[in-house]
Each structure stands twice: as C-alpha cells, then as structure tokens.
C-alpha cells in the first residue's frame, strides 16, 4: 500500500493534464504523495501541516465564487475583486501622443505686450509730468516716435518668439534676487544681534565698574559734568552757541540727575526711591525760586538781560546741586527745612526781642540821682 499515488479529483489534475506533466526545472520532479500516513507533502507545497492543504486550495482557486468567466460586452465592465486585486492596477493607455506643456500663443503675446507696456510706463509718466506728451511735435519728434514704435514692435515679436527662454531667465533672476535679499536680511539681523550683545556687555562691564568704584570716581565724574555745564554757559555768553536761556536753565538746574544714576549704580536699589524724592524736592525749590523771581520782576516792571539770566542759571545750578547733595547725605533734610527756617526766624526774632528788652531793662535800672545830675549839667 505504500508509495502508491492516488490522484486528487480536482482542478489540479486538469491543470497537470493541460500542462502535459511539465516538470519545473527549478524545483525538480514531483515527489510521490502517500495518502495514508501523510509523510510526503503535496507537490510544491510550502505548508508544514498537510491538513492546511484544503484551506490553501480554497484560497488559491476561490471556491466560494463562480469560476465562469464574466460576460464581456460593450456596455458592461468586468467585475473585479477589490479585496484580492492590488490597488492602482487599472491603468489607461493613452496612445494619442504626448501632451504639450508650452503656453498658448495668445498668452505669450499678452505677457510680452504687458512687459513692453511696463517698460514704457516710466517714459510716458515723465512726458505727462512735463506736459509734453503729443504736444508741439515736429518732424524730428514724430520720426523718433515712429522709430520707437518700430523698436517696440520688433521687441514684441522677439519676446513672443523666445518666450520660454526669457521667461525662464526672468524667473531665475527673480529667485536669485530673492535669495540675495534673504541672505542680506539674515546677515544684517546677525550683525544687529552681535552689535546689541556687544553693547549690552559693554554697558554691563561699565555698570559693574561704576558699582565697584570708589566715591572719588563719582566725584570726578560729577566735576566733569560741572565743567561741561559752565562751558555751555560761556559759549552761550560769547555767542558761539545759540541756545535758549530757559533750556540752559532747565537743563543745568536738573543736572543732578546724572549724580542720581551714578549713585544708583553704586548704592543699593532701595535708595532709588529716595533719590527721586530728593530730585523732585530740589526741582520744587528751584521752581519756587524762579516763580518768586519772575513775579518780583514783573511787579516792579523790570526785565532780565543776558547777564541776569546767567546769574539766575548759575545760582539755580549751585543751589540745586547743594540741596541735592544735602538731601542725599541727610535724608529728610528738605522736608525739615521749612521747620528749620521757621525755627531760625523765630530764634532771630526772639534774640532781637531779648536784645531790645535787655536795652530797656538797662535803661530802667539807672538810678534817678544820676539822671538828675546829668540834667543839671
């Protein structure tokens, strides 16, 4: 019973009969199949389990569907199996020829004509601006106009005929210019960034140096600022610098702001509020002095000349900086100043009163006999 081949009655036998028992040269002759023990696999089978043969055959030949060929006619398309067929297998064969990607002639002509119009637009605008467009034309002007029309016509024909060439050249040029602009913008942005970082580092180093500097450096810088202010005064006096007197007055009277920033980098942050308070108090005192001075001059119908302005500016500058220094050294001094002034005036009046009362007391303490003797003499 062994090594006997029982052929399967299926479509496989029909296929083998049609092929006239052809042998696959790559896989060799067909092995014998033993149906009893199943030791030998079916021919050219890739399955390890013979029981899966039926499933493979069912999948191969699709027993669940009709094996009859579809009815092809002119008005009916064949029914395809979307699940078994791979996508995009149906391709149309266009045998009519290759498509032409070139632009139509009218579009070429229109684009070329537009280019010539744009090229001539500046000249037309200039002639319209000069009011010389088709006005007072002689033989020479009309000859030039006709020659220019001929040149434009030839240019139109040339641009239309060589449209692909010059359009590609223009496109490449525009792309190149755009890339150049982009690279330039990136380079400028990097330059600005590097410059800003360098300036920030310089400012930081300067601020740290001022913060760690001693008080004498602050005084030296302050003295330099005073020299600059008085240089402005001298140049304004001799006419080398035509500045408004009020501008000089306001600028130099609040010059203590420089000291404010110098002290800000040297002192802790919490003193900034005190600095602003002292500065505004000094400005208030200076404003009061200016208002009183102007009021008195207007009351007595007097005018301040250039020398008077210089005296006023110098006085305000000295008084303002002195008050600011005093306020920074003794916090709250300006607030206590009215009280101190009142106390000083009261002390002065009290001393004057005591002196007057002392003189009266001395006169009252003279004996009567001495007064009579003096009267007799």
Swiss-Prot record:
* GO CC annotation: ascus epiplasm; endoplasmic reticulum membrane; vacuolar membrane
Q: Which Pfam families match?
A: WTF (PF03303)
Q: Disordered: where is this region?
A: 1-49, 64-100
Keyword Lipid biosynthesis tagged: no
Under the heading InterPro entries, the entry gives:
WTF
* Phenotypic consequence of gene deletion: Abnormal spore maturation in presence of cw9-encoded poison. Sensitises cells to cw9-encoded poison; simultaneous disruption of cw27 enhances sensitivity.
Q: Which UniProt keywords apply?
A: Cytoplasm, Endoplasmic reticulum, Membrane, Toxin, Transmembrane, Transmembrane helix, Vacuole
Record's compositionally biased regions (Basic and acidic residues): 11-29
Give the protein family: Belongs to the WTF family.
Under which name does UniProt file this protein?
A: Meiotic driver cw9
Q: Which organism is it from?
A: Schizosaccharomyces pombe
